Amino acid sequence: NGRNFEYISEDPYLTGKIAAAQVRGMAKHQIAGTIKHFCANNQETARSRANSVVSERALREIYLKGFEIAVKEGGAWSVMTTYGPVNGVWTAGSYDLCTTILRKEWGFSGIVMTDWWAMANYEGMTADKTMRAPMAAAQNDIFMVTSDAKASMEEDDMQKQLECGWLTCGELQRNAENILGFLLRSPALLHMNGRICQEELDAMNRKEDGDVLASDLKNLDEEENGSILISGALLH
């Protein structure tokens, strides 16, 4: 089942709708939810290396659809790629996934990050954690490690590929722009820098259709029989 045991459902439409609602709900409380794992990582055996061979139709209608809905309807700001490859191209360094589909087709404008110690590959080569230039070129903006992890101390190929021209300074600047854009529009940073006041920050937690606040319940008499109208766009 790969990472599917962590997912919302087996139905891509239902998954997308629920994920979009969750992302919107988190955003109301100044939290940017990360949707993952992008994509087609279903197999438990060798899940960090297994190659998911899938047709474009199945990819778009089943494995990408939930992510598409979460991006377009949920306004997701952050995406995490999987460990392994899809059709031979490791997702952490897949330009088709991270740029063509996610950013150009769906209009995603946030950050993309790898799973912990993910690998990427150049065409025809074995994948490795040190191959991070393909990640940067694909607009996978953040290589996820922790400060005490061995991978943090390993060399990578970024400088080498910059010097030989495979990776450009502009591509790295694009990654930086994605990360800074993500940070600069976050309500927490806007408030910390005095760009929005506390009242504006509090207003972002405003009540919306379908929400139930404590203030709504204060006039209810627990001894009194009756009915309550619950309404909202997401109520079915």
Model-found features: residue ranges?
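Glycoside hydrolase catalytic-domain context in secreted enzymes
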Residues: N1-H236
